[in-house]
Amino acid sequence: MVDARKNAPEQPPAGGWGALNATERQLARQKILVKGNRALLNMNKPGGFDCPSCAWPDPVKPHKAEYCENGAKAVAWEATAKRTGPIFFSEHSVSELRGWSDHALEDQGRLTHPLRYNRDTDRYEAVEWASALSEIGTINRQLDPDRIELYTSGRTSNEAAFLWQLYGRLLGTNNFPDCSDMCHATTTTALPESIGVGKGTVTLEDWEACDCLFIIGQNPGTNSPRMLALLHDMAKRGVPIITFNPLKERALVKFTDPQSPMEMLTGRGQAITSNYYQLRIGGDIVAMQALCKVVIEADDAARVRGDARIVDTAFIEEHTHGFAAFADYCRSLDWNEIERFTALTRAQLNQAAEIYMRSKRVIACWGMGITQHRNGGDAMQQIMNLLLLRGNIGKLGAGACPVRGHSNVQGDRTVGINKTPTEPFLQRLDRAFGFTAPRKWGHDTAECCEAILRGEVDAFLAMGGNFFRAIPDTERVSAKVQHLKLTVYVATKLNRSHLTPGEHSYILPALGRTEIDMQAEGQQTVTVEDSFAMVHGSTGQLKPASEHCRSEPWIIAQLAKGSVADRAAIDWDALVADYARIRDKIEAVIPGFDSYNARIAQPGGFHLPIAARQRKWDTPTGKANFLFAAGMMDEDDDVPERPHYQLMTIRSHDQFNTTIYSYNDRYRGVAGERMVVFMNQDDMARESLTEGDLITFRAVAQDGLERQVSGFKVVAYDIPSGCCAAYYPETNALLPLSHRDVRSNTPAAKSVPVQIVAQSAGTPVESAPEVSEQTPEAAGLISPLA
């Protein structure tokens, strides 16, 4: 059901009672109403556990309830009372389970036993830990390490990720496809070219001092809801919040703070965005350059008049390189072209630039609306150019803020999950563990998929995640997995990737972030790094889902003992008995972790050093660089004369990555379904479509392969003409592996060229998800909250 009234201007604010009700409903669905609410009071606080959802930082003084709606859903999903044990797998074949929806698979509950796939029965069967580990080790020892892939999910702790990279390098490979390859790897690769570091430069203290905020290609209401509390406070004190985003997102329009009694009583909420610019998909590069053009030309005029300069000349002269060439390029840009490629008017862009020029301390945020483009790195560098013009970096209240979407995705990279390790890192690793790590660069996610397609992979080992559902070209790649000799999935819940077994396949049940991790020397704490480079501890509070679940560090240690015990004199049992020993090794290998164990004992943890915060630039020029690609105007200019739309793939509000909590998207007025396409009304008229019509997407790709998915229901929405949006992972099959950012190989999932074809009555719906009989919606027990 889609209620168009929910998309109207008078729609209620985000947050408020809707968020509280949705939280309690999810806890009830997972049968942990009391237990779950008690656990939430310990989340994101010293001595408690870190949210397993997004990577937003914790405040110095936490609220009594320091969690958001979607963080609570993640906890409910992990701490559920439901279980997926051996009896379930004896009743359902893998072939049958492939017909289930993503939601239904995970909604069966927590995995309770190690499992081994039986090809004869087409079922997973319980297996003893010792047998599974021995068999995996035997197979791994026989393989060429260049044909082994080790995947890492973003919620993996620092301790587990460090052991995982150590295990992989002892095997002899740098093949480390990582979930960040599908989201913020663009930040990690492009930002260092500008400022010498691949992380954000701001802290929460900067947010409190900021006098202007830019939000570009991000939807915090769904992806980082705790960020809304800061946006709420900033808007309340009159800070201009400038949003560039194709879709009008409700949480960026108005938000009711659930922790404000007055707002909860009145339901009025706080307006968030002061200026909302709905630019065309792929228009970010030109939009940012247009703002720079206005600033530079205003500075030119001020210089001629003898007035105070608009750009920060002292900062530019001392700290930057390439300004003159960039300024000349911006001056040359034509406003007719700018308006055509951005779908914004000159007046709108002038307005945004005027606000920027009046402000003294500006923060710019971005999400995957920037990183998931073919030229995402170039777009990000234009954001940096805008900040550099007025010295908005390395001072209080200003800087760059990439908002990462998974709890420890930044930390995993920091501790060594990297296909291209530096020589200094490898030398420190060699000294710390007494072996010689491989120097040959490995695979990222896209390269791993390409290697699978070429038949060059024998083993795929996944530390969490849902790799074969999250990737582009899902159908092509997944079809090849059956030919792999080995697949190993460390997981908390059943998901679609587990239904693509290799010749030998295992599912190993892991503890979740919320659960007590008891090892030989007592209860353990793990650490994570948030989006602001703050490292802090996380200590589970709940009883494990099963006596057979094991911690990720323990699982890795046992895998290593079975595969690489003879390659270095490492006491794996001692490392796992007390994770402080793992942290000692991290301190020895990774710069910035001095006194690691002592500092995580402090409430809130510690910040890793970010050189650009001190205006130190680790770049070839020794300065921050103005970078641009001349003539790069459009995301879409390589498919001329082929009429198509630009599709952006998005999350629903009841979704975290490939995890689907329900079929509702409250903030967009959708309830009980996911197979929808959000379209501009003029485009609907052009295609002779009306609300509720079914369409087929056909990808417009350069490789000549046919990609299409069917059964999407048309929904009229506030989105620029020529653009449309639909949920992933249902649309991932449309995305070619080759359609990706040129630096990072991040899939260009926010700008997929597609044709929209109306389905005639009776056309079969190929991809519509089935609602499991076990879901409350299907049983009629709970009305979808809209």
Tell where the protein language model's regions lie, with residue ranges.
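Long, low-complexity segments enriched in small/aliphatic residues
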Residues: 573-665
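Non-catalytic alpha/beta scaffold blocks inside enzyme catalytic domains
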Residues: 106, 115, 185-385, 389-395, ...
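Long, structured ligand/cofactor-binding scaffold of large enzymes
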Residues: 52, 124-212
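Short cysteine-rich clusters marking metal-coordination/redox-active sites
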Residues: 48-54
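Short, flexible, mixed-charge glycine/proline-rich loop motifs
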Residues: 39-45
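Cys/His-rich metal-chelating microdomains
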Residues: 57
